[in-house]
């Protein structure tokens, strides 16, 4: 059930008002951080640790429910978030989050050494892949319109453990990404002012290389962006809308000028690096499409989720794909791909046609793009943290929503402090080595979760049906990994790819022939299981294109998070799931 009606929202608000009258928002008692029975004393904690194995088995097999996420979990915040966003707000929040400085840097690099003029096809391929993930997010956002986004979706369909590991990694990468944006913002501003990207940084020779350039400007930018996010969601949305309009005007200028000074001869040869170059560039430019998942976290603050979320997310991603393709085409038609400056493609291209002043427009657009990405990222990261805190995987104190602003101030402060510390000390070179493995991993898991949601309902799906579903799902995942491994190991010839492709087709066709045990109430992904299955394949293929450093970092971070989960998160969530309160039970009616 979806409590999206005004009456249900009123009921939640009334209960929250009664509770907030008895408690002050500004509090920090031990009970606010660790209210669970396992943490009441050393003896209870020792007893909990001794029961780690059976508790882990319980949480591995336990899933949350729609009802719990929509009602009981939200009450952990004591005050409701305000439903103040429309599809128009979501569309531009997504635009502001996704369209940053990356397109100005990556397009030139990939056109020069990756795909040539065919980089426009790379953007189209990545756009389609991102759109498939958007469709999955949109269906879940309509069905479970809460602040946690993918964390809640995975918790409902795949369970506590997988949701925590995935959420922990993506939250870490989101904070690292915010720190990187802060450092990039500082570099861009310094380049415009003094033509020296390190102009605002403080050199400390006694610190290790990569951590010896302190960046107070990056910290200031993060503090301002997160401070605005704390004052109110609607206010942040309006500011994002205004700045996004500036970006649109500059992009229109770039595209129009590019086409008016274009030469079709610059598009020949169109495939200088072959089909492989197009696909490899698609994996690189895909990062220009990330960020929409932060907007999915705003579902709880959307006025009409069933209408606004599909229009906002799907509409924005479609628009962004067209914008990126036009920008790539304009650049490659304006300048021969062999003459494109990989480091400052658009600025140098305009200089070649006598418009040196246009580099300032590009710089302003990049700065603005990073600013809106920080603003929307601040909103999304805080709400992700809020939902994790509602589950008690981290202290529930971070789930509290301020009664006046309707925003999770404590959660925002947490991500602000952590990302500011990272940005102050860590260089862009170090941050750029942290690839967005978890982002693709979660996109893949959300597609898997959508298939689970359609084909498996507890106590309804027969055991034979479940086994068939798991078998076909295994074929889809295994064949997708196989294609990625073949491609990235440089295997040539069509036989191996044909075999893996046929296996993927058989797995997907098998799912298509199985009966579905749940249908979307209002809006759903079309062509299930084909589109989610293709999304799984695309995301696994892109994961395979990452270097071994990304895999190693993911494994290390996961191991650290696993330690935290075994010593803290596991026992907190176990206590909440088994406390004698109806609203805290996980095994709701499915």
From Swiss-Prot:
GO BP: amino acid transport
Cellular component GO terms held in the UniProt record: intracellular membrane-bounded organelle; plant-type vacuole; plasma membrane
Transmembrane portions of the chain: 86-106, 115-135, 161-181, 210-230, 239-259, 267-287, 311-331, 360-380, 408-428, 430-450, 466-486, 494-514, 523-543, 554-574
Pfam families, alphabetized: AA_permease_2, AA_permease_C
Taxonomy, superkingdom: Eukaryota
Keyword Transport belongs to the record: yes
Compartments, as annotated in UniProt: Cell membrane
Chain positions carrying an annotated carbohydrate: 195
Cytoplasmic compartment segments: 1-85, 136-160, 231-238, 288-310, 381-407, 451-465, 515-522, 575-590
InterPro entries (alphabetical): AA/rel_permease1, CAT_C
Vacuolar compartment segments: 107-114, 182-209, 260-266, 332-359, 429, 487-493, 544-553
Keywords for the protein's UniProt record, in alphabetical order: Amino-acid transport, Cell membrane, Glycoprotein, Membrane, Transmembrane, Transmembrane helix, Transport
UniProt tissue specificity: Expressed in roots, stems, flowers and leaves. Mostly present in young and rapidly dividing tissues such as the shoot and root apical meristem, and in young leaves and petioles during seedling development.
Membrane topology of the entry: Multi-pass membrane protein
One annotated GO molecular function: transmembrane transporter activity
Location (main, coarse): membrane
Family, as annotated: Belongs to the amino acid-polyamine-organocation (APC) superfamily. Cationic amino acid transporter (CAT) (TC 2.A.3.3) family.
Function: Permease involved in the transport of the cationic neutral or acidic amino acids.
Descriptive protein name: Cationic amino acid transporter 8, vacuolar
Organism from which the protein derives: Arabidopsis thaliana
Gene behind this protein: CAT8
